[in-house]
């Protein structure tokens, strides 16, 4: 299968994790978009969705799926989203699309995190993909200096503003051997909203597209 075919296959496979009569959380990105397109075929089975970005909310609305504010719902049964990188320990780098903070919030509320990805996203060690860090604008230079002390090379994603009105620093040249530790350390820097490491709240299930079909991986 091509990469696009793998993405479509995992998007379809994720439908089996959608509970009837519930509200679900949905991520942001190309694979999440394909999942939304598949979800539209069974939209009558769910009560609605909580979106992790304005882009996702708009796509859901285009399909006639009700979008709910997270503050109006309680715990979500499932959150379905892609990843920029993922290990077999279910640790991820996310946020290539800049929606990492809202993705992390919605994932935290969900009982189960289903990651959908093609096989190119599976890695042994995180860090080849630049790690996004969402930062309060006035703290950009300070945070960049602090990240440099941690061994990273931050690059300002110029011209991009998050849905929360903040900026993104993409951190290059990290060899992330301890994702939980680094996630915590980065989040302790004053001015950092959050970073794209999803290690403290890792995925529960990975649906990975391969040449042979969809492989289900759990820890």
Curated annotation (Swiss-Prot):
A Pfam family hit: Rib_5-P_isom_A
EC number per UniProt: 5.3.1.6
Key words of the record: Isomerase
Family matches, as CDD domains: RPI_A
GO biological process terms on file: D-ribose metabolic process; pentose-phosphate shunt, non-oxidative branch
Domain of life: Bacteria
GO molecular function ontology, one term from the record: ribose-5-phosphate isomerase activity
Catalytic residue positions: 103 (proton acceptor)
GO cellular component: cytosol
Sequence similarity: Belongs to the ribose 5-phosphate isomerase family.
Protein name per the record: Ribose-5-phosphate isomerase A
Organism (species): Nitrosomonas europaea (strain ATCC 19718 / CIP 103999 / KCTC 2705 / NBRC 14298)
Gene name in the database record: rpiA
